[in-house]
A protein has these predicted regions:
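OB-fold and OB-like single-stranded nucleic-acid-recognition modules
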Residues: 1-219
Length: 219
């Protein structure tokens, strides 16, 4: 399994060198698709995909899928699927607050049935530019973690702003980055829950989706 994972990552690197944002996921849909919005050429439905790591931990990642790829005549909850697409950021307002949502936009989805024994996959490649000064901290395990926002261009003059997390040996190097640095990164998408304590009232819990960087190249 480990050798296959290494081969998959090498294939991903070769295949994605000519694009700026590419995601490959394989996991189980957690619910039925729900209508999200209607575009010019298609309707789009949202769902979440559950991915089991080799460590035994699970992550759920939100996905947006065109109706073209969805078999609406059958139940999709619990179905194992492979998705290829892009990790995108979307701005929206909640009350009087501006929010940013992260979502995988599916360019292709292949249903594989209900085979839970199939191997999961979570791979991402990004080619973009550091858009603000990195934030570095020491976590509770006494290890350095550096957060970087990567601006990744896509078609129609749009840009996605994607949070990336660097750990271990790459964290110190990432802490020295500055706006405008051109990076290519490989890794996986992860979800993380954090607690925000307002000045008054109950604590708020938020889920963030970010890229856990496993390899990087400065360009």
């Amino acid at each position: 399994m480990e050798n296959k994972t290494i081969r998959d990552r090498r294939t991903l690197r070769r295949e994605y060198r000519t694009v700026t944002n590419q995601v490959a996921l394989a996991g189980t849909l957690t619910e039925e698709f729900s209508f999200c919005r209607r575009g010019r050429a298609d309707s789009y439905y949202s769902n979440t995909i559950c991915i089991l790591r080799n460590t035994g931990s699970e992550f759920t990642i939100p996905v947006l899928v065109p109706q073209t790829w969805i078999p609406l005549s059958v139940s999709n909850q619990g179905r194992f699927v492979e998705i290829r697409g892009q990790f995108r950021s979307y701005n929206y307002t909640e009350g009087d607050k501006a929010r940013t949502a992260m979502q995988v936009f599916a360019l292709q989805m292949n249903p594989k049935g209900r085979f839970r024994s199939l191997p999961c996959m979570d791979q991402i490649f990004l080619d973009g530019f550091v858009c603000k000064m990195p934030s570095s901290r020491i976590n509770r395990n006494n290890k350095r973690v550096t957060s970087v926002i990567l601006a990744v261009n896509r078609s129609y003059a749009r840009t996605d702003y994607i949070p990336c997390v660097f750990r271990d040996d790459t964290a110190a190097a990432a802490a020295a980055f500055y706006p405008g640095v051109h990076l290519a990164v490989w890794g996986e998408i992860q979800s993380r829950v954090y607690e925000k304590r307002p000045a008054c009232g109950e604590p708020e819990y938020h889920t963030v989706y970010e890229v856990s960087v496993q390899h990087m190249e400065e360009r």
